[in-house]
Regions:
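Phosphate/ribose-recognition catalytic cores of enzymes acting on nucleotide-derived substrates
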Residues: 227-282
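Nucleotidyltransferase catalytic core that binds NTPs
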Residues: 2-238, 246, 250
Length: 282
């Protein structure tokens, strides 16, 4: 497996693969990899002969009061993990490679509407940072496909919108959320949880699953179900950002006849902001 840091090195290897007729998949990450990330790498391998994993802690998707400085940088450990995976190349650029004009003069890619609620409302500028860095990675790697996780449900919808709207020739594939044995969605931020908070954290998925089951069984009082779920989470000690039932394809408010729903939740427990979702097809 190769580890490259510069645009030139990346282009040299990509050119060789293209000459061989290989398809290239990209798995964008910020590092601090866990089993969930590795599952995305494996999914990428199922769709392409070559897999590039990018590791870049992107400053433009963090707010001023967020955890950019504290976010773990674990390239050495990540490299060891990826050597045992289906990855062919790690692309670990510096900020200057991704933003050659600097952060203040960087071009911003902004997707309207679908970014205005949920994580977009709670984290102003976050999705502009995500789409801007993903567009740059697409331009540098020029992958045939890219793989994102369902845990970041709104994010993968935003990236799909961007790719379609800009006619980017990149197929977007979504990988299933990978969970701990107790149901907690795997996340690099789970390590912020204290021991007692970690024992409480699975309640998030329990409440989410209960709401999903209610919808699957025909429940259609969305407002009541949202309110009851928020109360359960607050009672367990969560500071709830949102708990919302929406149309799965566009996050718009559903009517009672909608046959594909997504339940979205974000809540803070201690120093960790946890997000999760479940998709319900009726």
């Amino acid at each position: 497996m190769l580890v490259v840091h510069s645009k030139q090195e990346l282009e040299e290897h990509l050119a060789e693969w293209r000459r061989q007729g290989d398809h290239v998949a990209l798995v964008p990450t910020m590092g601090n990899l866990h089993v969930g990330h590795l599952s995305l790498v494996q999914l990428a391998r199922e769709h392409a002969e070559r897999v590039v994993v990018s590791i870049f802690v992107n400053p433009t998707q963090f707010g001023e009061s967020e955890d950019f400085d504290q976010y773990p940088r674990t390239l050495e450990r990540d490299t060891l993990r990826l050597k045992k995976s289906a990855a062919d190349l790690i692309f670990a650029p510096d900020v200057e490679t991704i933003y050659p004009f600097g952060l203040k003069d960087a071009t911003t890619v902004s997707v309207p509407r679908i970014t205005e609620n949920f994580c977009g409302a709670s984290r102003p500028g976050h999705f502009d940072g995500v789409t801007s860095v993903v567009a740059r990675l697409f331009a540098l790697v020029q992958p045939d496909l890219a793989v994102f996780g369902q845990k970041d449900y709104q994010q993968q919808l935003v990236i799909r919108h961007m790719s379609l709207d800009l006619n980017l020739p990149v197929a977007i594939i979504t990988g299933a959320t990978i969970r701990e044995e107790d149901g907690l969605a795997m996340s690099s931020r789970n390590q912020y949880l204290s021991e007692s908070e970690r024992s409480t954290a699975p309640v998030l998925y329990e409440v989410l699953s209960a709401a999903g089951e209610e919808l699957q069984n025909g429940g259609r009082d969305f407002a009541k179900l949202e309110s009851e779920s928020v109360t359960k989470l607050k009672d367990a000690g969560f500071d709830v950002d949102y708990f919302s039932i929406r149309r799965a394809q566009n996050l718009e408010i559903p009517d009672r006849d909608c046959d594909e729903l997504v339940v979205l939740v974000a809540a803070v427990l201690g120093d960790a902001r946890l997000i999760d979702n479940t998709v319900i097809t009726i």
